[in-house]
């Protein structure tokens, strides 16, 4: 009886205590822009409680015993703030905090268990230490990702990642502010992703993940995905002028439209523009032109709602020297930077509108809505085989399309608590519709005469998806992320060359489950296991002839990795990974034919190291190995052409308090097979770049050098069968685009 009485008394006291608990809520702002700051780590010292600010910079702690608490707010490249607040019974203390910017201090960086499933620690460090200053660096910010340009700078880069020759985007999902970059059923190749509509100076953050493990990332996210986020506000207005070798000129300007008055109302708007011209280092002038114009508004229309509107337009036109065969250079027919068909080139444009709306309801539901629209035009002239098919007129082809793309992304998420466990549930829907007119493959001569139409048609492609994602934090150390998405595709192709003109369609769907585990031993060590299924869609010109069969090949992957700090000022991310892909049929855009592609298997190791050597000097290095093989083929004939087997990139970054900053970087890719039996080899290269800037409050002066040691290297390489005019028989060998020689560029920026 006495025990029952004591238990009853204890319950009464506990209930009374619970009835008089308090809380803390707050908003964190970027001091320079006065806009809310997301992903800030907020810790209640000594309690084990922590939170991460949401899209609106908000955080909340509930059920706190009345007392005095010490709060610590931290974010990469912002100065950590520590202060005290008193919690009283039945009240929620509300705080507004501004974080000032500061140099990155790796000693203050911790491995957070709150956002284990995001794993953006490395990317957050890189974007602060290695600001993106040219269009090629936009993609190179992703560890292990290599690119190659083989069309004079106007064409989308060829991408290599995790044992994939991704071509121009088939197996990596790229977005900008959530808007898709990859183009389905593109005239040149499936998943073609041209990022040149992004002004490098406006990139604020890059989120990425390798492998098919993220529930809200659908089509093309097999090798991985990357989302490039542009600035919501400019710190200052600026004008930048650059000039370099090979008749290279560039002008960039960004104007803050609302200024201090806008910041006081948590609003910002700017307009920015970029113009580039170069004749480049090839023997034949490239006459490359590019124009970008961007306008963006970001504002809090209510305390719990923000609206972001972005409009942009992009245009580019160029000539290029194409891919040249080894034998033409070795025989002296052309120089290393020469051309067989100097009339290759192209023109492209893209106009975008993007609206994003985020709100947090009184019950803490986070609702996101996004609508986007793009008008896109593309025309490319190429000649890969010279006179192989047509010994009189040559083999030049034209690939052309006009496209309207529109879509919607929406999600609703809520954090709930069951006992001491946290459950974040997200339900999302996505819709994308591509309407392409006049998608053409033609035989041309000198970019002036059409000799024959190989393919001509209209494409109507729809992708609708729904997904459910759950992040469960069972303890402060252990969390699980489980999700599933369903994607539905409907493809329609109208063949305008058919007699009579005919229209056919097909449809299919795919289910992609994900299951990820994270265990954070302490603020210096986290172990994770990622598993999941992803896919990439196939060209409509494959889907329709195949009747919707074998056109959504699944990719099954797993990563076992860890993030740890062996020393206070060192961060290491290491992972062993595996990926298996189903057989599929693919459309070869350069030939207009459908070919089978067999099963494939890849596995390898990734290692990324970030180390602060001194208060102002930082070192980074990435090492990536892969063993890509075709499944079901004989040993020795099962190589995957051009798939990278070893890559590495790294360097030193300097950030002096007096305004001097710079970097010295290298990138290396090893020899790799260029065909299935490795009898033709694509040679590797080691190239170094340098950048040096001196920045004060009103101006900046900079020098950048690509290929610092003037290495002669082949940026892209292909095993191609071709015939040069006058040759009796065709020859299969390496065809390449030369990489830049030593290339220096000076820049001056004025801030106001």
Where are these regions (language model features)?
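Short strand-turn segments of transmembrane beta-barrel domains in outer membranes
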Residues: 207-215, 225-259, 273, 559
